[in-house]
Amino acid sequence: MIQTAIVGGGPAGAYCAGCLTENGIYPTIFDHTHPREKPCGGLVSSLAQELFPFLRHIPIEHTVKKKFYFVSPNGKKICLRDNLLGFSRLMFDQYLVNRAVEKGAELINEKVVALKRKGDFWHLKTKKQTYVTKILIGADGVNSLVRRKVIGPISKKDIGLCFGYLVNESVVEDITLIFSPYRKGYLWVIPRGRNTCFGICTTEISDSYGLKKELDMFIQKNYPNITKDSSWASLIPNIKDPRTFSVPLAGTNWILIGDAAGHVNPISGEGILYALLDGELASQAIAENSPRRFNQLWTERYGMNLFSKIKTRKWLYKKPVLELYCQTLRGISTLTP
């Protein structure tokens, strides 16, 4: 029998596994897809680096940028100062998984296709066999199987869409985020050392018509000579109402973390910081033999900040307000997720 099973080996699940091993608990990670690239730009903010200093010393290729640019819907360009790290998500996710395994976690490269609770235990079924675990952690993304089983799926209205390309060459020096004049979302151009990530996101699936075309037109206009080496599309949580979090994200023997919990900045789409925070807090709750306490821990740690951003998002993406917001950013040295 498995003591603690983590479904999902992305940043939330892998970091949680590593934290658990430091408390003498050696979990099993189930994931058949990670590591993988994503249209996510792989940016790590200065706040994330401050809270998790190991990020500054990860021995994988990355970029370090002291500034980045915002472009408003009307085309006004604003330079902001911040200390940003840029990672390939393939390499970043792989590092976190390897780190956890080296500390004693187990990785099973199988997809969990069904879950069933029997008494005080969970039965996890893969295509090969059935596993039994005492504690279950759902870190399996926006379409989380674990979430669907314990509290139900994230509502479609609370899901956004990203699409992106990876170009295997250094195209630009600067990070640039361009607010879309056509939808609630933005485009990005992010240098990542040997390659460059181009992407676009919308905060609402219902607003995703023409998403790929908008990115293609932007690239054709500004970078007509690049070669798109690969492409991705992915769903992301984008919670529209703080009351969504009135439902517990942890119970007597289960916890939801990261994207599965809906913990993503609803304005910027930043998820890595929340993934690491959730991984740390979930491991703390389990180490205290009280998985349910995760509800209290995450709410106290950053809940009010997240709720505030959810409320701000309602009016921020109105074009006149967004233009004003971009202007107020002038002179700000650091932004926090």
Question: How does the language model describe each region?
Answer:
Residues 114, 206-282, 292-293:
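FAD/FMN-dependent oxidoreductases across multiple families
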Residues 7, 30, 139, 257-258:
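Active-site flanking residues adjacent to catalytic metal/cofactor-binding acidic residues
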Residues 9, 99-229, 246, 262:
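Predominantly flavin-linked oxidoreductase catalytic cores and closely associated redox partners
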Residues 5-9, 18-40:
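Glycine-rich FAD pyrophosphate-binding loop
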Residues 13-14:
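N-terminal Rossmann-fold NAD(P) dinucleotide-binding loop
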